[in-house]
Amino acid sequence: MNLLLIIVLVILALIIVAYVFLQQPKFGKRPAGERLEKIKNSPNYKNGQFQNLSHTPDITDGANYFTVLKEFFFGKSKRSKPPTTLPSQKTNLLTLPPDKNVLVWFGHSSYFMQVDGKTILVDPVLSGSASPIRFTTTSFKGTDVYTTDDFPAFDYLFITHDHWDHLDYETVLKLKPNIKKIITGLGTGEHLQHWSFDKNILIEKDWNETIILENGFTVNTTPGRHFIGRAIKRNSAIWMSFVLTTPTQKIFIGGDSGYDTHFKTIGDNFGPFDLAILECGQYNRYWKYIHMMPEEVVQAAIDLKTKLYCRYTGPNSPCLYMPGMSL
């Protein structure tokens, strides 16, 4: 009887600890009120959550969560983490000539663009961690040369989705004074308002919508093949890619995505592109529906009809299991 009581108390204690842990502000907040009603009216929201265009299992057929967790903790290739400090070059973002077009990649999925006089930041993660538990997914040495103090005020912050390696609580709070407008998917604004961002700077859209910005800049919101969630509840907001049209450039801003027909559709509707920025580095045989394999990235670039493509989500933190040589 005493043993049973101890087991019950331990389980109860774990539940309480988990509940308290999940109440931290960094986990954000589920959509509610008018935002939730708008979500429910989305053609992409079915059965209580946003859906991909194609059937998209989280894990490849024949595997399960136990298989994935086992490989994550015990099956990573020795090449998944560099043995030495990675080389980098730090560009001074505060002194850039305003008429110069620039792309600066910070590792993983974070990058800065200055295009036709506008400054743009995409999915910044500068805290050194891509996880709610800091020590589990830390940045590689040499990839964290920038801090939030290195950034000028910028016109547009793009957030493709709310995963920890794309929407970093610590980073966006520190950058708050620098941000003029935030462009993101429907539902993600709930996190940002919960973190005291002014709703008037938020532009939240569903797939296949158009945003008219200043000085000849336009954004078309386009699909990806992925999922979202910062805690237990999944797919309460929509994951995005974006078509950015400027006076002289057309750029595809790709979020995390498995390969699918949406790339060809986007290419047919909006191509050709001057530049497509595509993920390539989070690939794994168990994740093939939600992250592209290297050869699929090339096909996506072809589908998009892009003149140039830049691959991102390269090594910054040890999330991938397969050898980096596959790149």
What is each model feature region?
Residues 2-137, 184-253, 274-280:
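Metallo-beta-lactamase
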Residues 124-126, 162, 224-225, 255-257, ...:
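Active-site metal-binding loops of divalent metal-dependent hydrolases
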Residues 136-183, 271-277:
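Active-site metal-binding motif and surrounding structural segment of the metallo-beta-lactamase
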Residues 3-40, 45, 156, 181-190, ...:
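Cap/insert and terminal regions of metallo-dependent hydrolase folds
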Residues 126-143, 227-233, 284-290:
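Acidic/histidine-rich helix-loop elements
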Residues 113, 123, 161, 168, ...:
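Divalent metal-coordination and catalytic microenvironments
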Residues 111-114, 212-273, 288, 292-296:
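Catalytic core of the metallo-beta-lactamase
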